[in-house]
Amino acid sequence: MSEIIIRKARREDCEAIRMFIQELADYEKMPDGPKIDYKTLERDGFDGQPLYLCNVATSDEKVIGYTLSYYTYSTWCGKSMYLEDIYVTPDFRRKHVGKKLLKAVAKEAIENDCHKLDFVVLKWNPAQEFYKMYRASDLTSKEQWHCYRFVEEDLKKLASDCE
């Protein structure tokens, strides 16, 4: 197997990353979930003030996985990071690529004074075992936290109700 290299994503990686976002959504049984295109990824990640951080894993200069994360803030501990996605193509799973990608995110978080890294995993996803190997805590079972979301339509309604 060729050497696996983890590096910061570049603008030209956005088409591959967008394809992987769809592959991840398909795996998560949410194929209609992703609405953005690679141009949006380019704009939001590489124009002006980047809205996210992205690393890619490469083998023979071909992108084989990625992480997408961003900074958040916790009123309990301060600066934090959120891991939106971690994905490795099927041919490279169980070859420590995910570990290398996750370690790169952890390193970025620590180097930037983040106190925690949050993420969500679907209840049925066997990747939970991967995260537990590295001592991630399941906050739903440990602290009874549940994740909620306002989708765009409901967010607009809520905002208009405030006027």
State each model region's role.
Residues 99, 111, 123-143:
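Conserved active-site alpha-helix within GNAT-family acetyltransferase domains
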Residues 86-93:
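A short, internal acetyl-CoA/4′-phosphopantetheine-binding micro-motif in the GNAT/acyltransferase core
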Residues 43-56:
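A short helix-loop-beta-strand connector motif used in the catalytic cores of GNAT acetyltransferases and
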